[in-house]
Amino acid sequence: MIYGIGTDIIKIDRIAAALGRHGDRFAERILGKEELEKYHRRKAKVEARGLRFLATRFAAKEAFSKAIGLGIHMPMTWRAAQILNAPSGKPIVVTSGKLAEFMQENGLTAQVSITDEVEYAVAFVIVEKK
C-alpha cells in the first residue's frame, strides 16, 4: 500500500551557488559518508559530475522527506538518508539511526528515481507500507 509520494526539482545553479558560498561544508552537511566519498571521486574527475551528483542527492532527499511526511525534521536528517546504488546501478534509499528505526517500526520501504540534465535535477520517491 502506498504510504506517501514525494517529488523535487532543483536548479543545479542553486547547488553551485551554495557550494560557492560554503565550499565543501555544504556537501558535508547534505551527504552521508558513502555519498560524500562518491561525490569527491566524481568531483575530482570532472567538477560538473560532482555538482550534478550533489544536486540529485539533494533532490532525492527532499522528495524522500516529503514521501515519509516528515520534511527535514527528526528523525529525517540529511545524512540519515543516503541515496546509494544497488549492484545493478539502480538508486536506493539507505537509512540509518533513528530514521532507520522509524522506517522499520512503520513497515516502510522506499523506491527512488533520479535524473538530471544540464540545468535541473529531479527526484521522485514512492514510500510503501508493508
UniProtKB/Swiss-Prot annotation:
Enzyme Commission number(s) of this protein: 2.7.8.7
Annotated InterPro entries: 4-PPantetheinyl_Trfase_dom (IPR008278), 4-PPantetheinyl_Trfase_dom_sf (IPR037143), ACPS (IPR002582), Ppantetheine-prot_Trfase_dom (IPR004568)
GO BP terms: fatty acid biosynthetic process
Reaction it catalyzes: apo-[ACP] + CoA = holo-[ACP] + adenosine 3',5'-bisphosphate + H(+)
GO cellular component, one term: cytoplasm
Residues binding Mg(2+), per UniProt: D8, E62
HAMAP family to which the protein is assigned, alphabetical: AcpS
The family this protein is said to belong to: Belongs to the P-Pant transferase superfamily. AcpS family.
Its job: Transfers the 4'-phosphopantetheine moiety from coenzyme A to a Ser of acyl-carrier-protein.
Protein name: Holo-[acyl-carrier-protein] synthase
Record lineage: Bacteria, Pseudomonadati, Pseudomonadota, Betaproteobacteria, Burkholderiales
